[in-house]
Amino acid sequence: MTTANITKHKTAKHRVLIVGGGFAGVRAARQLAGNSELEITLISKDAYFAYYPQLYHAATGGSRSEASIPLAELMGGLHVRIVNDKAMALDTKNQTLTVTSGSIFHYDDLILALGSVTNYFGIAGLQDFAYDIKTIAGAEAFKQHLHHELVERHKPEVHYVIIGGGATGVELSAAL
């Protein structure tokens, strides 16, 4: 979507509603913020942006501040309204989105940038015993597990299986 093809109303600002505060949502908001004819609202369930490349660091005992950047800081100086809430209902006919607090947002254009979720592929027990490191909460849960195993249970010879050979998997295995 370019700013040229969504600025059709001259009497009022064109309302762009972005749902999702991850990479795609933040990039869209920052890119569109330069157009003064747009009114941009970013709805995110979290007040921070989870920077995936640093989540492994937070999971293995490092500071979570490098992996968790406040959205207000990322949008500083830009004309982007940030709403910390969760989308609940979408009415495409009336072009509205309702969030869990009950607020209703009207839009002219909607960008759904909701991210991804971990797929456990129906493998029995995997969801119960695996840790995903896609969120700050997931990284924190893994960090607590590591602390419990290494410090409280005095088990320095713990073995882990890392599923995924992407950047996060490689960085995590190196950190462990």
Task: List each language-model region with its residue ranges.
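Beta1-alpha1 glycine-rich phosphate/pyrophosphate-binding loop at the start
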Residues: 2-81, 160-161, 170-176
